[in-house]
């Protein structure tokens, strides 16, 4: 492998942003395939203290705590222009990278919360036509947004996102976020809504996303058997309690700011 070649030619190498789980093969003391590669690194920078502790306990002496470089990559992109007519100073729920389970939780609630505007961005944009046919409320499509009259934009309850790459900026229009994937293959990016101060709700499959379980992050993890009523309770609590929403927005921004700087820490150590 690559690290074997690097060791053979005496080329130093380091590993950034490792996150080790209990029981991982690289921690086994009798693993002659992986341990030489990892112990041969000059530095192995870990995302969390828990990961570093497991590393050190396994006998490695090259571990360092750096933090998570994803926090440095997530940017606070400005909201797209022209959405003010649609949002209309109303609370906005952004449903990001949704799969069918998240949509099944949401769709029955659209009539129940008439004051709520929804930006709905499915993970698979080819499903937009199918989703469109299921919506019981007026909607507009993002790709054609400028072609709608201002009346249609204002009347729409749902903005269907049928393009790729715009979701990070659309989070800037929101107040709450339902992030998809965690009832199925695994959680999608929750740092994008958090950087804009949105409290997040998601499913339970959050392995590999330590930030979803961090007590300092305003993230609510729903059980696998969640129903529309479960989601309704979460939404209602925040719509009826703006101070809670503001508190969670501040919490999210503090959480992001606290964990920035990992890339700089790696660079500073390697520059010594």
In which residue ranges do the predicted regions lie?
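Nucleotide-activated sugar donor-binding and catalytic core shared by glycosyltransferases
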Residues: 1-272
């Amino acid at each position: 492998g690559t690290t074997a070649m690097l060791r053979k030619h005496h080329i130093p190498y380091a590993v950034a942003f490792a996150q080790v789980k209990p029981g991982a093969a690289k921690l086994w003391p009798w693993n002659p395939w992986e341990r030489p590669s990892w112990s041969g690194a000059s530095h192995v920078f870990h995302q969390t203290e828990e990961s570093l502790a497991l590393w050190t306990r396994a006998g490695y002496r090259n571990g360092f705590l750096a933090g998570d470089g994803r926090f440095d990559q997530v940017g606070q992109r400005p909201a797209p222009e022209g959405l003010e007519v649609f949002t209309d100073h109303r609370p906005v729920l952004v449903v990001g990278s949704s799969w069918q389970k998240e949509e099944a939780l949401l769709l029955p609630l659209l009539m129940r919360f008439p004051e709520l505007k929804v930006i709905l961005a499915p993970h698979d944009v080819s499903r937009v036509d199918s989703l469109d046919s299921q919506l019981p409320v007026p909607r507009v499509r993002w790709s054609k947004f400028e072609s709608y009259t201002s009346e249609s934009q204002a009347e729409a309850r749902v903005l269907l996102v049928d393009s790729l790459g715009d979701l990070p900026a659309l989070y800037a229009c929101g107040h709450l976020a339902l992030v998809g994937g965690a009832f199925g293959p695994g959680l999608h990016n929750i740092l994008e809504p958090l950087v804009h101060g949105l409290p997040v709700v998601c499913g339970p499959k959050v392995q590999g996303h330590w930030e979803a379980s961090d007590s300092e992050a305003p993230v609510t993890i729903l059980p696998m058997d969640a129903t529309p009523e479960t989601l309704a309770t979460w939404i209602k609590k925040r719509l009826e309690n703006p101070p809670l929403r503001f508190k969670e927005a501040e919490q999210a921004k503090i959480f992001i700011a606290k964990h920035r700087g990992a890339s700089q820490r790696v660079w500073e150590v390697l520059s010594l």
